[in-house]
Structure formats: structure tokens, C-alpha cells
């Protein structure tokens, strides 16, 4: 039984049985589409703090995450009186029920599984909001703060502490039920719930994820150099390094290699939430139409996907890389037209792609562009393209 007295600010007091409330929360979570829930203490993540500091020293972080290590590892800085954290997980599909139409010569790219269906940030927000409302109704005056991977806390560490799963060598939370195909969210609260036990790490001696990583971004089990991760580069704006381009293939957003290689994901494919179901033509879109899509068309078609958060520019650049990967000579006219695009990274990547695909037409276009181009990075790409054609 917990009694929280009122204080000088006039906050209402309340008395509740936390064990009963915890069970009520667990049962309610099942009715609103939360697939797994766990409870953890809100003590600082001391070991994690040292690892994150080391990551910063090595320049291994992506830059998309919260830069303040203290905020990432100390829940008390995010909520006054933080006593525990409720962690949730939602399972997402690993396979598409419907297949895309396959026609010879029509090349496609693909979005990673975590980007299928409705943006998972919105789905998690919906579930956490409902959970908040339930707890507030049970405990008037309670303090809570919810977040997803865009928040301050390191969600994988929270999920691990709360017994959702273990932290795999592929830097993902692996659950016994759903593998690593789960979205994570958490809620800090001033209610001191009894914490759940963490799950034993079951990776063992397996290193399949490390071996499957196309760029060697998994430095060692549980340590990622985001600056080498394909998923990171598909989300950046600007030029992609040559060595990464060669590994991207036809990925438009994200990379699943370290997940599909994991034995714990073998046979895993849950379709529990209709809003997560992928639309085949969005998950695996045709490449050439992407080159000419307008901002309005892109937002209308892809705007509800998590993979659209950086806008159309990275997706278009990645589509160019994918066409080069396929050496699709039917795209030559499209790529030659992009040599006049106002965006340097699009012009430059198109020049590189023309060099990869090859042919007299590509060579003539690159030579003509070299006499007009003024951007030094684009000029470098044009020279690289011409050098490939001379081989």
C-alpha cells in the first residue's frame, strides 16, 4: 500500500495498492493493443552512461539521438519524483501478406520493416496516451512522462531492465515472443511499482548479425558505429560515401540485415495491428517514378510512413543509388535529366550512377555536364563517373 501525502503546494493525497494497480495496468494494456509490458526502477542507468560517453568519444553516434548523456541515463532529470518506468512493446510484421506486382525491367526499392504501415511513432503515442489516461483515472494527481525513440531515454536499456527482452548483439531488443520485430515505448512515473526481472541474454556465441552487416557497422556484439550503418546513411541528406553506396543496394530507407540474420527471428511474423500492415506499393515502390515525384505527391503517398520523416530528398537519392545497383539502362534518360537538378547531391549521385550503368549516352552526358557544373562535389562525382566509364 502506498500513501502519498499532500504537500505545501496543495497537491491531493492518495492511497493505492500498487500491486493491484500494476495488475490492472497489465490487463488493460492487453485491451488497447500493447503486446508486452514491463516495469523497471527509475534508478540512473550507470553502466549505460559510461558506454554512451565512450560512443561519443569514438564518434559512433548518429546525431539523431538526444545529445545529453545525463538526460539519456537519469530519469529523475526528466520527471520530478521519478520512481519507476513502464516499458511497452508492440510487435510489427516481418512479411507482407500481399506481394507487389513483378514485371521484367521494372525495378523496385524497399523500405525496412519498421517503416511499414502507419508511422510507429503515432501508434506508440496512441497506446501510451491511453495508458496515461487509464493511470490518471486510477490515481488522480499522478505524474507521468511518456516517450518513444525520439525521446530522451535510451529505450533499449529501459526495455531490457523491464524484462521486455534482452539487448542483442545486433543492438536491438530481442523478445522471446516476437523476436526483435518490436516497437518500444516507455512511461516514467512517480509511482514506485515493483520492478520486473530482466530476461537472460540468449545470444550465446552466435555472431550471425555481425557477419551479416554489409558495412561492418556492428563493431562487436552490442556496439554499433552508426556512422557506418546503412540505416543511418539512408536517412541522411547530402552525399553518401562511395564505399557505403556500393553496399546500399536497393534499400530506400533503413536496413534489416542484422535482424533477418538473427536465428531468434526465424519464423517470426506477427500481424496483430491492422495499422501496421504494409501497402506493397509503398513498402516496395517502383524506383523510376520516385525520381520525379513532387513534394506534394510524396507527402500524400508516403507521408504516413516512418520512412518519410526526412522528406523526399534522401529517398530520391537512394532510388538513384538503387538504379545504379541494378545497372538499369532504361533509367539513363531519367538520370541524365537529373544532371540539371537544383540539388547538388541529386546531380552528383546521378552522375555517379551514370558511370556505374555505363554506355556512350552516359559518357556524352557526363562530358557535357562537366563543362557547365560549378559545384566542386558534383564535379568530383562527374569525374568519378567518367573514370568508371574508362575502365
Regions inferred by a protein language model and the residue ranges of each:
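Cationic, low-complexity basic patches in intrinsically disordered or flexible, solvent-exposed regions
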Residues: 4-5
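Auxiliary alpha/beta "docking" domains used to position bulky ligands
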Residues: 14-202
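Short, charged low-complexity linear segments at domain edges
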Residues: 173-198, 225-244, 295-299
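Iron-sulfur cluster-binding cysteine motifs and their immediate structural context
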Residues: 208-231, 248-275
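Glycine-rich phosphate/pyrophosphate-binding loop
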Residues: 280-317
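Amphipathic alpha-helical scaffolding segments comprising HEAT/armadillo-like alpha-solenoid repeats
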Residues: 297-302, 328-340, 359-371, 391
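Short inter-helical turns and helix N-cap capping residues of alpha-solenoid HEAT/ARM repeat scaffolds
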Residues: 312, 342-343, 374-375
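Structural detector for internal amphipathic alpha-helices that build alpha-solenoid repeat scaffolds
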Residues: 316-328, 347-359, 379-391
Amino acid at each position: 500500500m502506498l500513501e502519498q501525502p499532500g504537500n505545501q503546494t496543495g497537491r491531493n493525497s492518495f492511497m493505492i495498492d500498487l500491486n493491484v494497480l500494476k495488475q490492472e495496468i497489465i490487463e488493460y494494456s492487453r485491451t488497447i493493443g500493447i503486446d508486452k509490458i514491463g516495469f523497471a526502477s527509475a534508478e540512473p542507468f550507470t553502466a549505460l552512461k559510461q558506454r554512451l560517453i565512450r560512443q561519443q568519444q569514438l564518434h559512433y553516434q548518429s546525431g539523431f539521438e538526444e545529445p545529453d548523456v545525463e538526460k539519456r541515463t537519469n530519469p529523475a532529470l526528466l520527471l520530478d519524483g521519478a520512481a519507476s518506468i513502464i516499458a511497452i512493446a508492440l510487435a510489427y510484421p516481418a512479411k507482407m501478406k500481399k506481394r507487389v506486382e513483378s514485371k521484367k525491367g521494372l525495378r523496385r526499392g524497399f523500405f525496412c520493416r519498421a517503416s511499414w504501415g502507419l508511422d510507429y511513432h503515432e501508434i506508440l503515442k496512441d497506446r501510451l496516451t491511453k495508458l496515461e489516461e487509464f493511470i490518471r483515472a486510477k490515481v488522480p494527481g499522478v505524474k507521468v512522462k511518456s516517450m518513444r525513440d525520439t525521446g530522451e531515454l535510451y529505450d533499449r536499456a529501459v526495455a531490457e531492465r523491464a524484462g521486455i527482452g534482452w539487448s542483442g548483439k545486433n543492438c536491438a531488443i530481442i523478445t522471446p515472443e516476437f523476436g526483435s520485430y518490436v516497437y518500444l515505448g516507455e512511461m516514467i512515473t512517480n509511482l514506485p511499482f515493483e520492478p520486473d526481472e530482466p530476461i537472460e541474454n540468449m545470444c550465446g556465441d552466435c555472431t550471425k548479425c555481425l557477419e551479416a552487416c554489409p558495412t561492418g557497422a556492428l563493431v562487436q556484439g552490442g556496439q554499433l558505429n552508426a556512422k557506418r550503418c546503412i540505416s543511418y546513411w539512408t536517412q541522411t541528406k547530402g552525399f553518401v560515401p562511395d564505399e557505403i553506396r556500393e553496399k546500399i543496394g536497393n534499400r530506400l530507407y533503413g536496413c534489416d540485415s542484422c535482424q533477418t540474420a538473427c536465428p531468434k527471428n526465424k519464423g517470426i511474423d506477427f500481424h496483430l495491428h491492422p495499422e501496421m500492415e504494409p501497402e506493397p506499393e509503398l513498402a516496395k515502390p517502383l524506383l523510376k517514378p520516385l525520381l520525379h515525384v513532387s513534394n506534394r505527391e510524396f507527402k500524400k503517398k508516403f507521408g504516413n510512413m516512418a520512412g518519410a520523416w526526412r522528406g523526399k530528398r534522401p529517398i530520391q537519392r537512394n532510388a538513384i543509388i538503387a538504379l545504379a545497383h541494378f545497372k538499369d539502362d532504361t533509367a539513363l534518360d531519367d538520370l541524365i535529366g537529373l544532371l540539371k537538378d537544383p540539388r547538388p547531391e541529386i546531380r552528383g549521385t546521378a552522375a555517379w550512377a551514370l558511370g556505374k550503368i555505363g554506355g556512350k549516352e552516359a559518357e556524352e552526358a557526363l562530358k557535357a555536364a562537366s563543362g557547365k557544373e560549378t559545384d566542386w562535389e558534383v564535379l568530383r562525382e562527374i569525374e568519378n563517373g567518367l573514370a568508371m566509364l574508362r575502365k
